[in-house]
Swiss-Prot record:
Major location category of this protein: membrane
Transmembrane segment boundaries: 19-35
Membrane topology: Single-pass membrane protein
Gene source species: Oryza sativa subsp. japonica
Keyword hit for Ribonucleoprotein: no
Signal peptide: none
Required for DVL/RTFL small polypeptide activity: region residues: 56-87
Name of the protein described by the UniProt record: Small polypeptide ROTUNDIFOLIA LIKE 2
Domain of life per record: Eukaryota
Known function: Small polypeptide acting as a regulatory molecule which coordinates cellular responses required for differentiation, growth and development, probably by restricting polar cell proliferation in lateral organs.
Keyword Transcription belongs to the record: no
Family: Belongs to the DVL/RTFL small polypeptides family.
Organismal lineage: Eukaryota, Viridiplantae, Streptophyta, Embryophyta, Tracheophyta
GO cellular component, one term: plasma membrane
Amino acid sequence: MAYPLLCHYIKAPHSSFPLIPHTSHYILQLVYLHLFHPLPCTQHSHQTMKIEGRRGQMGRLNRAFREKRARFYIFRRCVIMLLRWSD
């Protein structure tokens, strides 16, 4: 997953001021680029996060469904075994 801040740094070298290597200025400039120069890269990362969230939710639902199905199968087999045993 690409980080939006890194993506802005890579795709937006056209900033109105040069990046200063000093850490605090560098971070402030990256934050400025991130906030005031929106690029499709951030939209892509937000969409990716939404899709991953949906996948996680679907994974939990599928896991719960499989567990219920397995329990029902065991219950059904036990009932059949008891019915045949009583004959």
